[in-house]
């Protein structure tokens, strides 16, 4: 799919509509007169302008789009054409119709680029494609695969889902788990990237019987995190980092407010970094259960156990590389969501077949016998060989004269 700027997007969409109009409704096409002259050329060179003139050219294209949309909106057969629907969609997403104060006529105003939605039309040849500032225009694919630490099982893809590029990864985790459960392939532990690890996703996954291991989104906590306070089993603070006990605790609608003695807080050596807010009469700290869960997860991220478990997540990047290099997934020769979904599914299936064959062949291959009877002696010989190799490289390129 070509990457079109706003001017080329207008030109391609209008030209596609006029081409179909000429093919199926020749008389209506002929009635447009001089409007179609610029769009008859297959090249977009006639619409190439300097950056300083692009705003003016966009207004002209917006006026042409508005004229065509209004001209044929009552024509039933033309209004049913996909190319006309794309033109209407483009105009709605890119333009605004306002009333002119002078003569009360309609005036087309081009929307600012920042106001254009990421799910807007990117190319009339592929209306299902979306836009992502990080990934660009087109589609994205969610992938979930198995992994085995001891290599006793092959790593196989258990879930894929093709989406428009504008879709957020945060909304993909729970549907992926539910899809895997419907196939009886649901994992007990799932490693995911940061965007998948929202608190809502973690809690919903627990209800589905899946433990999600993912870094916490958002800003890092300050010098004194909430986890520095002591909590009981009900997520209530029992002491501050300096072991001062709260005077009283109030809970209302899931929000907990802890009140500390202001006299003690005034002489605390850590008051500059403390989370407690200083008020006239008291010092208070307000939090909810979500904040407690997040701070505990941030504390767990620093543990060796978390790092050892999470390091396997990077393996899925190798899978994405395999899908690209071995199957050409990033360069499909089809357009439209149904066709892209079918192609992606077949390529993922093909990669699974290749992995199963490689796994079976590895099991059939006889294991090499361990020839090292004396590891200490072998290490000594390896060191001697390395020194000899260095000396050979050093003297090998020199000329010597003998008497």
Please name every model-derived segment.
Residues 1-403:
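Anion-binding and metal-coordination hotspots
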């Amino acid at each position: 799919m070509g990457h079109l700027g706003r001017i080329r997007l207008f030109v391609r969409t209008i030209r596609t509509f006029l081409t179909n109009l000429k093919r199926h409704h020749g008389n209506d096409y002929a009635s447009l007169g001089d409007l179609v002259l610029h769009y008859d050329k297959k090249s977009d060179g006639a619409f190439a302008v300097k950056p300083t003139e692009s705003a003016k050219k966009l207004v002209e294209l917006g006026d042409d789009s508005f004229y065509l949309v209004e001209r044929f909106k009552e024509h039933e057969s033309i209004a049913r054409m996909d190319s006309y629907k794309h033109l209407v969609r483009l105009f709605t997403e890119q333009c605004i119709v306002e009333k002119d104060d002078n003569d009360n006529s309609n005036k087309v105003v081009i929307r600012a680029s920042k106001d254009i939605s990421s799910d807007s039309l990117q190319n009339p040849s592929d209306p299902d494609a979306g836009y992502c500032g990080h990934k660009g225009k087109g589609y994205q694919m969610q992938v979930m695969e198995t992994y085995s630490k001891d290599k006793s099982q092959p790593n196989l893809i258990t879930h894929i889902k093709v989406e428009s590029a504008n879709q957020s990864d945060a909304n993909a985790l729970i549907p992926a788990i539910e899809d895997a459960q419907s196939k009886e392939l649901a994992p007990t532990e799932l490693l995911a990237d940061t965007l998948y690890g929202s608190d809502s996703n973690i809690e919903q996954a627990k209800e589905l019987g899946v433990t999600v291991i993912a870094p916490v989104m958002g800003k890092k906590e300050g010098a004194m995190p909430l986890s520095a306070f002591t909590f009981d089993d009900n997520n209530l603070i029992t002491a501050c980092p300096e072991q001062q006990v709260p005077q009283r605790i109030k809970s209302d609608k899931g929000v907990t407010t802890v009140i500390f003695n202001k006299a003690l807080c005034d002489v605390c050596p850590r008051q500059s970094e403390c989370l407690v807010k200083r008020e006239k009469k008291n010092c208070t700290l307000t939090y909810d259960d979500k904040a407690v869960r997040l701070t505990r997860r941030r504390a767990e991220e620093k543990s060796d156990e978390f790092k050892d478990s999470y390091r396997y997540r990077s393996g899925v990047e190798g899978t994405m590389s395999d899908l690209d290099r071995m199957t050409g997934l990033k360069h499909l020769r089809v357009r439209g969501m149904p066709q892209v979904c079918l192609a992606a599914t077949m390529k993922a299936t093909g990669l699974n077949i290749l992995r199963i064959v490689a796994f079976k062949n590895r099991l059939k291959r006889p294991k090499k016998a361990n020839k090292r009877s004396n590891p200490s002696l072998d290490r000594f010989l390896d060191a001697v060989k390395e020194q000899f190799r260095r000396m050979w490289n050093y003297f090998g390129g020199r000329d010597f004269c003998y008497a």
